[in-house]
């Protein structure tokens, strides 16, 4: 398996992987593929990695800048992340996350946030912090941060407007 940055030739495959990964998971009409498209079109897709297996895109992870208290402070949001359903639970998503976090550090990021299952994301160094909030999280424990160098900032996190897309 190869982990590499997306190219313009990967866009349709990324859309298909994302749709396959999210259809029926939370909704029969997922919007995660539209988030990726919106970030890309706005020039806000800071890091976009694909997992390629035998010449096929089987996974994808996106990272984009977030603001804290209305300011960019060197923090990024992880997501969406998707893996072809037939290949899930085989380490592809974990590899994408690990590689993405390494590359964010190399880019000078101060940390990364995400909304997701703490039982999964804790293994990558993510945890909830009472003073860093995202109002869109279903419960506080589902919004987590992974500081790379400093203490976690305090305040409210806001994702790029592409995250608030609806069908």
Where is each model-derived feature located?
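A short beta-loop-alpha structural element at the N-terminal edge
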Residues: 2-14
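Active-site rim helix/loop that mediates acceptor-substrate recognition in acyltransferases
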Residues: 15, 22-67
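Conserved beta-strand segments that form the floor/walls of ligand-binding pockets within enzyme
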Residues: 50, 62, 77, 82, ...
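Conserved G/P- and acidic residue-centered "switch" motifs that form tight phosphate/ATP-binding loops
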Residues: 55, 91-93, 108
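A conserved beta-turn-beta hairpin within the catalytic core of GNAT-like acetyltransferases
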Residues: 66-78, 88
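Conserved acetyl-CoA-binding loop-helix of GNAT-fold acetyltransferases
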Residues: 78, 83, 89-102, 114
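Conserved active-site alpha-helix within GNAT-family acetyltransferase domains
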Residues: 106, 110, 115-140
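C-terminal "cap" of GNAT-fold acetyltransferases
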Residues: 135-167
């Amino acid at each position: 398996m190869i982990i590499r940055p997306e190219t313009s030739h990967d866009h349709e495959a990324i859309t298909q992987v994302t749709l396959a990964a999210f259809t029926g998971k939370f909704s029969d009409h997922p919007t995660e593929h539209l988030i990726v498209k919106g970030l890309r079109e706005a020039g806000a897709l800071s890091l976009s990695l694909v997992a390629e297996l035998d010449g096929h895109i089987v996974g994808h992870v996106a990272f984009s800048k977030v603001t804290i208290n209305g300011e960019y402070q060197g923090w990024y949001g992880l997501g969406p992340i998707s893996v072809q359903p037939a290949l899930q639970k085989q380490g592809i998503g974990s590899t994408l996350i690990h590689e993405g976090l390494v590359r964010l550090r190399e880019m000078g990021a101060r940390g990364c946030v995400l909304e997701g299952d703490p039982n999964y994301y804790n293994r990558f160094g993510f945890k909830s912090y009472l003073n860093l909030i995202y109002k869109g999280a279903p419960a506080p424990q589902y919004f987590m941060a992974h500081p790379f160098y400093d203490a976690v900032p305090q305040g409210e996190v806001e994702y790029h407007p592409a995250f608030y897309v609806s069908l």
